[in-house]
């Protein structure tokens, strides 16, 4: 029997994601597969903040190269890591049903962000999170926090940080306990990254099983995530810039919330659009236009200096 080769990063969370797709392939598509671990640029360079490494696709480039060579059949990504413009010949075969989209506060000593003392050190990999933390608490010190989920938790528990911010979806997938205090921010309190909580399966568009993999697609999640990706694409952005965007469906209505600003919490733009689902992509363009008129491009250029 033919076996598909799934390319995956080697972290515990990435392997959970790859195994999740492997199990669904067997159950829903009657297809066997095996996992090949691939080290990406983002995995190799751990002593620098992600925004300082430079370039897009820090966690996807090497996987995409193997897809183009035909060395693997599909690559499983956290959708938030997937660049909005694909290498020629590649595309997403499916976007899975979204898990919890929220960001989560974790601390050993303090119950929430507002209870942290002045000058407390908060660890995060994300300029988007730093920006929204600083928007609420200018007196906090946000610092880069690299490594897998367990490594980050150990740094919290040994006192390197007073608090850290992680994605709730990853914590739930790994069934993470640890940290005395754990509190998820609402989407309004901290707008997530594009695609947060969803997995994206990338393949060659002409792969013979590309259509088959669409059985794993979740229509509602895919629709919302594509709206978010369209917004990021319009700003020529990626996952290492201070932008949050979240689209949600409520019956036939869609709501798109977005935030953009400097990592220090200054010059922040926050806007939202609501309307009929049939006008969803028009609403994205209207929101983009409002952001651009408010100086979004100039703010993003300044953000490159941080």
Predicted regions mapped to residue ranges:
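Small-molecule-sensing regulatory modules
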Residues: 2-46, 52, 135-306
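Short, Asp-centered acidic motifs that coordinate Mg2+ and/or phosphate
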Residues: 72-76, 162-163
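Short glycine-rich anion-binding loops that position phosphate/pyrophosphate groups of nucleotides
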Residues: 79-82, 169-171
């Amino acid at each position: 029997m033919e076996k598909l080769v799934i390319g995956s990063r080697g972290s515990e969370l990435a392997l959970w994601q790859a195994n999740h797709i492997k199990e669904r392939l067997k159950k829903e598509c009657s297809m066997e597969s095996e996992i090949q671990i691939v080290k990406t640029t983002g995995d190799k360079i751990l002593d620098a903040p992600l925004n300082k490494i430079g370039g897009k696709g820090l966690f996807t480039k090497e996987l995409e190269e193997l897809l183009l060579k035909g060395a693997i059949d599909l690559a499983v990504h956290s959708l938030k890591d997937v660049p909005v413009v694909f290498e020629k010949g590649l595309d997403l075969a499916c976007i899975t049903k979204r898990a919890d989209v929220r960001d989560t506060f974790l601390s050993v000593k303090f119950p929430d962000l507002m209870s942290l003392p002045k000058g407390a050190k908060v660890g995060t990999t994300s300029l988007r999170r730093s920006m929204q933390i600083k928007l609420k608490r200018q007196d906090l010190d946000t610092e880069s926090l690299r490594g897998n989920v367990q490594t980050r938790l150990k740094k919290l528990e040994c006192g390197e940080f007073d608090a850290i911010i992680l994605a709730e979806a990853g914590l739930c997938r790994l069934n993470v306990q640890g940290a005395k205090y754990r509190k998820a921010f609402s989407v309004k309190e901290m707008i997530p990254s594009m695609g947060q909580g969803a997995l994206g399966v990338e393949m060659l568009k002409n792969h013979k099983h590309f259509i088959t993999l669409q059985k794993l697609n979740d229509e509602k999640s895919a629709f919302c995530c594509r709206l978010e990706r369209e917004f990021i694409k319009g700003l020529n952005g990626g996952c290492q810039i201070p932008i949050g965007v979240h689209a949600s469906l409520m019956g036939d209505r869609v709501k798109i919330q977005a935030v953009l600003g400097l990592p220090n919490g200054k010059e922040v733009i926050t806007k939202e659009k609501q309307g009929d689902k049939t006008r969803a992509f028009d609403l994205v363009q209207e929101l983009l236009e409002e952001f651009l008129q408010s100086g979004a491009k100039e703010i993003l250029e300044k953000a490159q200096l941080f």
